[in-house]
């Protein structure tokens, strides 16, 4: 069959690239995506360039010019076959003379069974059909030229077709991971478009289906003829596996910056390795980034500092390409490289706005040239150091460090487990909330109003807690990893600030082989008092419609983000709505994977997905604007990403949640939750406080000034 050329108008939605991927599979060619305000590209296009048009979903109302943009022109000026999805469907109907009004209830990330007429888009598709809906508005009073082709059981209009032209609209989202027969529907649209143009559609009844869920292959060993770069990796396996806590202090206590990427909760397939290191050798660097300045500052091992214009993403992309070093045959892919964080305000470089100024750098990384790696599964440990062929003295320096570090580890005694003090020995915390609890509740209500008006589907709202006074960060981290062990825990120490994280959520892992994986979390419940109650809580979470809708919205958003940078047909969801259990909570987790296109760098892939959708909501761009307005301040490190970019081409970053950021003046904590149409404001306040428990408990172990128990503190905060 010949390929079909589709123009896909993007109404700034976070699901457009799910349509992109499906259309590319069905059509045999990737569609051209044009944003609804990209008039320059639009002016260079003509109807003859395409076989059909798809108008994407999006936030807002189709009568609002800025919400619809070029979608209005393509609907009114072009006579090509057209499919409108959600907002596109509403626009098609409105411009034909229908009314668009509030639906009986907002319906986002939830499924419905619809009945259809079996014709046109619905040919050879069973009825009833299960579909996912994301809408607060609905179409009423269809004009004579449009006919209804699908409804829900309660009579809500779900699809239309023009009586004389190949024009169709669907209120639901055929591209959602939980909608049935989406590929068949788009294939039907392809065939209808070809017929309209006088072409014979394909005879085969076989419809391209989503790619199977292939297991990521192990990274291939580099060939003997692999190009030789500037850097050399020096590796030495140590005879004994040291205690991570003791080794961190013994090897890196004097480093100006240091990291502990800590699998404090070892999970097969999730967390096997712990990495401890620093920019402690002659090749080490410290990097800070300020969005407003749009420049990276690099401080080298000798203390010299340079300013390099451009974004942090640009800097990482350039330097990783220049410093590439193939994987070494070790069981892990982190063969040294960049370790640090991307603060939430870095969103200004990935589609968001530069709305707020924080006290700390918007991004901070260290180029680590010294490291200890621990394999918790095999019980092995390695020391790693870098040298440069351009600086011959760095090779013997690396070997000396390996020898000295191995000798140090051989005589380092394990540190005793951290002992948590009882409540009656702890002073009380002076917790300052950016938004009081009544005000936070009002913000939840405002989010629900925005959802009702169709401006957004889900808002991940945040509150910031500040505890004045200085703490010992390492003591607080030891308490945190004891209270709340997590697979993506981390301790990052930079001059002026230390990040202590017990994150359970993977933002994005990219293997050296190019396979990417994200594991968004949406849905949280406190653990039950006993085994029976705990099992009941877990089962309740797994079945809860509100939590599943939150999770599904973010899964579809992450699929969209990966769909921008991954091979056609490679994005898939091997795990949907799985409950993971932690020390204090159960959480609803899904897994999304895809294979990066060959020309996509790791920083570019991270940039496409940043900030993580589980910390913004959807649609991402519009919702971030509302977050800027509602929260009235920076999030800082919180809700950004933390982890490493390896010289091997691998990267692994967590979502910054369950995290303390400590400075000389105070410790700050970010907490919040996803607000959807089904949210109860009081429940959202309780969830926010629940998520603060572990970090506040750790602060109480390290901070001078606490008295009340965590339960009393939380109860008092609710009053």
Swiss-Prot record:
SUPFAM superfamilies, per database record: ADC synthase, Class I glutamine amidotransferase-like
Residue positions of the active site: 86, 173, 175
InterPro entries hit by this protein: ADC_synth_comp_1 (IPR005802), ADC_synthase (IPR005801), Anth_synth_I-like (IPR019999), Anth_synth_I_N (IPR006805), Chorismate_C (IPR015890), Class_I_gatase-like (IPR029062), GATASE (IPR017926), TrpG/PapA_dom (IPR006221)
Recorded phenotype for the gene knockout or disruption: Disruption of the gene abolishes pristinamycin I biosynthesis.
GO biological process: 4-aminobenzoate biosynthetic process; antibiotic biosynthetic process; folic acid-containing compound biosynthetic process; L-tryptophan biosynthetic process
Family: In the C-terminal section; belongs to the anthranilate synthase component I family.
Name of the protein: Aminodeoxychorismate synthase
Biological source species: Streptomyces pristinaespiralis
Gene: papA
């Amino acid at each position: 069959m010949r390929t079909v050329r589709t123009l896909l108008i993007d109404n700034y939605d976070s699901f457009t690239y799910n349509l992109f991927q499906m259309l590319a599979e069905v059509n045999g060619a990737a569609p051209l995506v044009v944003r609804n305000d990209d008039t320059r590209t639009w002016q260079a296009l003509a109807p003859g360039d395409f076989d059909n048009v798809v108008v994407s979903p999006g936030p807002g109302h189709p009568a609002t010019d800025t919400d619809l943009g070029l979608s209005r022109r393509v609907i009114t000026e072009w006579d090509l076959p057209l499919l409108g999805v959600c907002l596109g469907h509403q626009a098609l109907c409105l411009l034909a003379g229908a009314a668009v009004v509030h639906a009986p209830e907002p319906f986002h990330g939830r499924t419905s069974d619809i009945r259809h007429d079996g014709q046109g888009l619905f040919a050879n598709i069973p009825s009833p059909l299960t579909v996912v809906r994301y809408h607060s508005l609905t179409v009423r009073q269809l004009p004579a030229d449009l006919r209804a082709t699908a409804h829900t059981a309660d009579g809500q209009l779900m699809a239309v077709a023009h009586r004389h032209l190949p024009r169709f609209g669907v209120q639901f989202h055929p591209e959602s991971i939980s909608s049935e027969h989406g590929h068949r529907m788009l294939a039907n649209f392809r065939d209808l478009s070809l017929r309209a143009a006088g072409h014979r559609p394909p005879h085969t009844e076989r419809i391209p289906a989503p790619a199977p869920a292939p297991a990521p292959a192990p990274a291939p060993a580099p060939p003997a003829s692999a190009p030789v770069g500037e850097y050399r990796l020096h590796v030495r396996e140590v005879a004994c596996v040291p205690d991570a806590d003791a080794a961190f202090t013994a090897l890196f206590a004097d480093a100006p910056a240091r990291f502990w990427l800590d699998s404090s909760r070892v999970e097969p397939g999730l967390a096997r390795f712990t990495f401890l290191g620093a920019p402690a050798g002659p090749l080490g660097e410290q990097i800070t980034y300020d969005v407003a300045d749009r420049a990276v500052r690099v401080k080298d091992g000798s203390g010299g500092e340079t300013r390099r214009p451009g974004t942090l993403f640009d800097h990482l992309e350039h330097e990783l390409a220049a410093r590439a070093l193939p994987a070494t045959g070790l069981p892990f892919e982190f063969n040294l490289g960049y370790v640090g964080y991307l603060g939430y305000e870095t969103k200004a470089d990935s589609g968001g706005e530069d709305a707020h100024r924080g006290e700390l750098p918007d991004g901070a990384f260290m180029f680590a040239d010294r490291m200890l790696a621990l394999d918790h599964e095999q019980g092995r440990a390695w020391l790693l150091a870098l040298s440069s062929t351009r600086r011959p003295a760095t090779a013997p320096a690396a070997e000396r460090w390996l020898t000295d570090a191995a000798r140090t580890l051989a005589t380092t005694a394990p540190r005793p487990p951290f002992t948590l003090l009882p409540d009656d020995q702890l002073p009380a915390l002076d917790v300052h909330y950016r938004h009081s609890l009544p005000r936070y509740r009002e913000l939840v209500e405002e989010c629900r109003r925005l959802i009702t008006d169709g401006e957004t589907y889900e808002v991940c709202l945040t509150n910031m807690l500040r505890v004045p006074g200085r703490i010992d960060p390492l003591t607080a981290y030891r308490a945190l990893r004891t209270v709340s062990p997590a697979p993506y825990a981390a301790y990052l120490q930079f001059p002026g600030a230390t990040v202590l994280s017990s994150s359970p959520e993977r933002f994005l892992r990219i293997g050296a082989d190019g396979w990417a994986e994200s594991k968004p979390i949406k849905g949280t419940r406190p653990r039950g008092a006993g085994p029976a109650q705990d099992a009941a809580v877990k089962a309740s979470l797994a079945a809860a419609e509100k939590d599943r809708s939150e999770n599904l919205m973010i899964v579809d958003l992450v699929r969209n983000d990966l769909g921008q940078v991954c091979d056609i047909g490679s994005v898939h969801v091997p795990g949907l709505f799985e409950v993971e259990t932690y020390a204090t909570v159960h959480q609803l987790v899904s897994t999304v994977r895809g294979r990066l296109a060959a020309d996509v760098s790791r920083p570019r892939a991270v940039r496409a997905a940043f900030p993580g959708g589980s910390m913004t909501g959807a649609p991402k761009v519009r919702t971030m604007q509302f977050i800027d307005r509602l929260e009235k301040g920076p999030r800082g490190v919180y809700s950004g990403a933390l982890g490493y970019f390896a010289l091997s081409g691998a990267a692994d970053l967590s979502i910054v949640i369950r995290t303390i950021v400590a400075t000389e003046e105070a410790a700050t904590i970010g907490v919040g939750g996803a607000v959807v149409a089904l949210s109860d404001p009081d429940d959202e306040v309780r969830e926010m406080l629940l998520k603060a428990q572990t970090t506040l408990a750790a602060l109480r172990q390290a901070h001078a000034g606490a008295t009340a128990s965590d339960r009393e503190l939380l109860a008092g905060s609710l009053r």
